[in-house]
A protein has these predicted regions:
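Active-site-facing substrate-recognition patch
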Residues: 1-51
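Short glycine-rich phosphate-binding loop at a beta-alpha junction
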Residues: 51-58
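Gly/Ser/Thr-rich loops at beta-strand to alpha-helix junctions
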Residues: 58-63, 129
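Short Gly/Thr/Asp-enriched flexible loops that form oxyanion-binding sites at enzyme active sites
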Residues: 63-72
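Short, glycine/charge-rich flexible loops or terminal/linker lids adjacent to PRPP-binding catalytic cores
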Residues: 74-120
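Active-site/ligand-binding-proximal alpha/beta "capping" segment
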Residues: 128-142
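Conserved small/polar residues in nucleotide/adenosyl-binding loops
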Residues: 147-153
Length: 155
Protein backbone atom coordinates (compact mmCIF):
# COMPACT_ATOMS: atom_id res chain seq x y z
CA UNK A 1 0.00 0.00 0.00
CA UNK A 2 1.58 3.20 -1.26
CA UNK A 3 0.25 5.44 1.54
CA UNK A 4 1.77 3.22 4.25
CA UNK A 5 5.04 2.96 2.33
CA UNK A 6 5.24 6.74 2.06
CA UNK A 7 4.50 7.15 5.77
CA UNK A 8 7.19 4.64 6.72
CA UNK A 9 9.72 6.46 4.55
CA UNK A 10 8.72 9.85 6.02
CA UNK A 11 8.37 8.96 9.70
CA UNK A 12 9.81 5.49 10.29
CA UNK A 13 13.15 5.21 12.04
CA UNK A 14 15.66 2.41 11.61
CA UNK A 15 17.19 1.16 14.85
CA UNK A 16 20.28 -0.97 14.42
CA UNK A 17 20.24 -3.43 11.55
CA UNK A 18 16.86 -5.03 12.05
CA UNK A 19 14.23 -2.82 13.69
CA UNK A 20 11.93 -0.33 12.01
CA UNK A 21 10.38 2.00 14.59
CA UNK A 22 6.91 3.15 13.56
CA UNK A 23 5.56 4.19 16.95
CA UNK A 24 5.00 7.77 15.76
CA UNK A 25 1.96 6.66 13.73
CA UNK A 26 1.22 2.98 14.24
CA UNK A 27 1.76 1.52 17.68
CA UNK A 28 2.43 4.17 20.32
CA UNK A 29 0.76 7.18 18.79
CA UNK A 30 -1.87 6.09 16.26
CA UNK A 31 -2.78 7.94 13.08
CA UNK A 32 -6.42 6.90 12.83
CA UNK A 33 -6.81 8.29 9.30
CA UNK A 34 -3.94 6.09 8.15
CA UNK A 35 -5.50 3.08 9.89
CA UNK A 36 -8.79 3.77 8.11
CA UNK A 37 -7.00 3.60 4.76
CA UNK A 38 -5.25 0.39 5.81
CA UNK A 39 -8.62 -1.07 6.87
CA UNK A 40 -10.12 -0.19 3.48
CA UNK A 41 -7.19 -1.86 1.75
CA UNK A 42 -7.63 -5.07 3.77
CA UNK A 43 -11.30 -5.04 2.82
CA UNK A 44 -10.42 -4.61 -0.86
CA UNK A 45 -7.89 -7.42 -0.82
CA UNK A 46 -9.96 -9.94 1.17
CA UNK A 47 -13.48 -8.92 0.19
CA UNK A 48 -14.40 -12.24 -1.44
CA UNK A 49 -13.16 -14.44 1.40
CA UNK A 50 -16.35 -14.34 3.52
CA UNK A 51 -14.41 -13.27 6.62
CA UNK A 52 -16.52 -13.59 9.78
CA UNK A 53 -13.88 -12.75 12.42
CA UNK A 54 -10.63 -10.88 12.69
CA UNK A 55 -7.94 -12.27 14.99
CA UNK A 56 -5.01 -10.30 16.38
CA UNK A 57 -2.72 -10.28 19.37
CA UNK A 58 -2.60 -7.66 22.10
CA UNK A 59 -1.71 -4.92 22.14
CA UNK A 60 -0.50 -3.13 19.03
CA UNK A 61 -2.57 -5.13 16.55
CA UNK A 62 -5.88 -4.20 18.18
CA UNK A 63 -6.18 -0.73 16.61
CA UNK A 64 -5.70 -1.91 13.03
CA UNK A 65 -7.89 -4.95 13.64
CA UNK A 66 -10.78 -2.88 15.04
CA UNK A 67 -10.79 -0.39 12.20
CA UNK A 68 -10.52 -3.18 9.63
CA UNK A 69 -13.39 -5.03 11.33
CA UNK A 70 -15.64 -2.03 10.74
CA UNK A 71 -15.23 -2.49 6.98
CA UNK A 72 -16.06 -6.21 7.22
CA UNK A 73 -18.80 -5.73 9.87
CA UNK A 74 -17.31 -8.56 11.93
CA UNK A 75 -16.04 -8.89 15.52
CA UNK A 76 -12.40 -8.72 16.57
CA UNK A 77 -10.92 -11.44 18.78
CA UNK A 78 -7.53 -10.79 20.31
CA UNK A 79 -5.13 -13.22 21.91
CA UNK A 80 -4.34 -12.13 25.46
CA UNK A 81 -0.78 -12.30 26.72
CA UNK A 82 -0.16 -14.04 30.02
CA UNK A 83 -2.60 -15.61 32.46
CA UNK A 84 -5.88 -13.84 33.18
CA UNK A 85 -8.41 -14.88 35.82
CA UNK A 86 -11.29 -13.54 33.74
CA UNK A 87 -10.47 -15.77 30.75
CA UNK A 88 -10.68 -19.09 32.59
CA UNK A 89 -9.26 -22.46 31.58
CA UNK A 90 -11.35 -23.02 28.46
CA UNK A 91 -8.75 -21.53 26.11
CA UNK A 92 -6.55 -22.24 23.16
CA UNK A 93 -2.99 -21.18 23.90
CA UNK A 94 0.44 -21.03 22.36
CA UNK A 95 3.81 -19.40 22.99
CA UNK A 96 4.82 -16.44 20.85
CA UNK A 97 8.28 -14.88 20.68
CA UNK A 98 8.48 -11.08 20.58
CA UNK A 99 11.28 -10.02 18.28
CA UNK A 100 11.39 -6.45 19.62
CA UNK A 101 11.23 -7.42 23.31
CA UNK A 102 13.31 -10.59 22.99
CA UNK A 103 10.89 -12.51 25.22
CA UNK A 104 8.40 -15.35 24.92
CA UNK A 105 4.77 -14.85 25.94
CA UNK A 106 1.98 -17.30 26.52
CA UNK A 107 -1.03 -16.07 24.54
CA UNK A 108 -4.57 -17.37 24.88
CA UNK A 109 -7.95 -17.08 23.18
CA UNK A 110 -11.17 -18.28 24.78
CA UNK A 111 -12.71 -21.29 23.06
CA UNK A 112 -15.98 -19.33 23.09
CA UNK A 113 -14.71 -17.02 20.35
CA UNK A 114 -13.12 -19.27 17.72
CA UNK A 115 -15.16 -22.11 16.28
CA UNK A 116 -14.87 -24.69 13.54
CA UNK A 117 -15.92 -23.13 10.26
CA UNK A 118 -14.92 -19.58 11.15
CA UNK A 119 -13.35 -17.60 8.30
CA UNK A 120 -10.64 -15.71 10.14
CA UNK A 121 -8.47 -12.88 8.89
CA UNK A 122 -5.30 -12.46 10.97
CA UNK A 123 -4.18 -8.86 11.42
CA UNK A 124 -1.10 -7.64 13.26
CA UNK A 125 0.60 -4.28 13.48
CA UNK A 126 3.91 -5.25 11.91
CA UNK A 127 5.73 -8.31 10.66
CA UNK A 128 9.13 -8.89 12.22
CA UNK A 129 9.78 -12.60 11.86
CA UNK A 130 6.23 -13.93 11.69
CA UNK A 131 6.14 -15.38 15.21
CA UNK A 132 2.89 -13.63 16.18
CA UNK A 133 1.15 -14.74 13.00
CA UNK A 134 2.48 -18.30 13.41
CA UNK A 135 1.17 -18.35 16.98
CA UNK A 136 -2.27 -17.15 15.87
CA UNK A 137 -2.33 -19.80 13.13
CA UNK A 138 -1.52 -22.40 15.80
CA UNK A 139 -4.49 -21.20 17.87
CA UNK A 140 -6.78 -21.44 14.83
CA UNK A 141 -5.55 -24.97 14.12
CA UNK A 142 -6.29 -25.93 17.72
CA UNK A 143 -9.85 -24.76 17.17
CA UNK A 144 -10.09 -27.06 14.14
CA UNK A 145 -11.34 -24.06 12.22
CA UNK A 146 -11.70 -24.36 8.51
CA UNK A 147 -8.26 -23.27 7.42
CA UNK A 148 -8.20 -21.50 4.09
CA UNK A 149 -5.16 -19.44 3.25
CA UNK A 150 -5.86 -16.73 0.74
CA UNK A 151 -3.01 -14.48 -0.19
CA UNK A 152 -3.88 -10.89 -0.99
CA UNK A 153 -3.42 -9.52 -4.46
CA UNK A 154 -0.45 -7.24 -4.89
CA UNK A 155 -2.50 -4.50 -6.53
Amino acid sequence: MKLLEERIIADGKVIGDDILKVDMFLNHQIDVNLLQEIGKEFKRRFDGCNINKILTIEASGIGIACITAQYFSVPVVFAKKGAHKNVGDNVYFTVVHSFTKGTDSLVAVSKDYIKKGDRILIIDDFLANGAAVSGLIDIIKQAVSYTHLTLPTTE
